[in-house]
């Protein structure tokens, strides 16, 4: 038993307390297996509250100082920044976390990234078999008129991408880009990322944006229809010659009023351990937050190595309101 514990939790002393309250926006069965391992190795039982990010934020606001939450996990830098701005995180106190997690994925000692994903472009192979597409800016090209599909402008995935563009390209250039992309839309924005991939495969759209793990999920699917979709599209890692592809995170921190802060810190340290980072990649097709982790996911590996944008997640998050205002002014629904 000790050897198993050492594998996952090097240099960590087991807590005497037996409970941890987790508020999480993640809903994957592979995560639950990770939680079971943590409980088995520490004796700390995880009480999980799972809901959408906004619902969790509303619940935390309603509960106030009486909240039982110990750890908060949210998807996307925009949502994490909102939680930080609302005062829902306390300061992290862990040298291990600060030494392990790259500074790009830390925010004011309040929260850290746990996994990463890329905002990639998917293209209909038949419609654009050899068209060279290199950047997010290319989405605004006139040749893609009535071809582009996307999520709603209010979705954090869109807000984070546009936030990064404002930082990298300036607000006026980004506003001009957004206006031209709106003119290229094939339909009113709707649906999730998987819906965009399906629309590109069907020919309803010629080109779209998606988070990388949605594509890998289809690549790994045992459903023949999903695999047929994958055969009809190709993907592009944008901005390889400039800033690098936009990266985002799922992240977490210790709740402001955590009744079990030691357990919360122990849990976050567990989530950034080498083995758990491998399990995240294997289970939900996300890249590890830490470097030099061997992936046990051939489809994720098949996306290849690529240049990543180096922007701080905290900086991306705090620009989201400006991004929303810009998209509204551009007419992006």
Task: Write out the residue ranges for each language-model feature.
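Early extracytoplasmic/lumenal segment of secretory-pathway proteins
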Residues: 17-82, 333
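Short beta-strand->loop
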Residues: 23-26, 89-96, 107, 110-112, 123-125, 131, 137-140, 224-246, ...
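A structural signal for short loop-to-beta-strand junctions that line the ligand-binding cleft
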Residues: 67-72, 90-121, 137, 147-150
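A bilobed periplasmic-binding-protein/Venus flytrap-type ligand-binding module shared by bacterial periplasmic
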Residues: 120-127, 163, 247-260, 279-282
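Periplasmic-binding protein-like
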Residues: 146-154, 270-294
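Ligand-binding pocket segment of bilobal, Venus flytrap-like solute-binding proteins
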Residues: 164, 169-238
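An extracytoplasmic/periplasmic, membrane-proximal ligand-sensing/linker region
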Residues: 173, 285-333
């Amino acid at each position: 038993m000790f050897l198993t514990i050492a594998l996952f939790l090097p240099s960590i002393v087991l807590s005497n307390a037996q409970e941890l309250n987790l508020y999480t926006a993640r809903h994957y069965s592979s995560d639950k297996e990770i939680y079971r391992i943590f409980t088995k190795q520490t004796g700390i039982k995880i009480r999980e509250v799972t809901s959408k990010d906004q619902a969790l934020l509303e619940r935390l606001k309603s509960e106030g100082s009486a909240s039982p939450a110990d750890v908060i996990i949210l998807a996307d830098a925009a949502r994490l920044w909102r939680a930080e701005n609302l005062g829902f995180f306390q300061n992290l106190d862990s040298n291990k976390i600060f030494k392990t997690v790259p500074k790009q994925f830390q925010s004011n000692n309040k929260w850290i990234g746990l996994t990463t994903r890329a905002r990639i472009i998917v293209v209909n192979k038949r419609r654009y078999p050899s068209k060279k597409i290199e950047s997010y800016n290319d989405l605004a090209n006139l040749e893609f008129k009535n071809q582009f599909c996307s999520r709603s402008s209010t979705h954090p995935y869109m807000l984070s991408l546009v936030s990064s563009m404002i930082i990298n390209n300036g607000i006026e250039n980004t506003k001009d880009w957004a206006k031209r992309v709106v003119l290229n839309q094939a339909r009113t924005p709707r649906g999730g990322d998987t819906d965009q991939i399906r629309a590109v495969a069907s020919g309803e759209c010629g080109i779209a944006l998606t988070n990388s793990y949605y594509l890998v999920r289809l690549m790994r699917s045992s459903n023949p229809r999903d695999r047929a979709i994958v055969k009809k599209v190709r993907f592009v890692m944008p901005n390889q010659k400039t800033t690098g592809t936009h990266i985002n995170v799922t992240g977490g921190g210790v709740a402001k009023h955590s009744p079990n802060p030691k357990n919360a810190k122990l849990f976050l340290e567990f989530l950034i351990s080498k083995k758990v980072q491998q399990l995240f990649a294997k289970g939900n097709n996300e890249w590890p937050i830490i470097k030099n982790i061997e992936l046990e996911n051939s489809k994720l590996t098949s996306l290849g190595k690529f240049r990543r944008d180096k922007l701080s997640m905290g900086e991306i998050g705090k620009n989201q309101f400006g991004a929303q205002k810009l998209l509204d002014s551009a007419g992006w629904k």
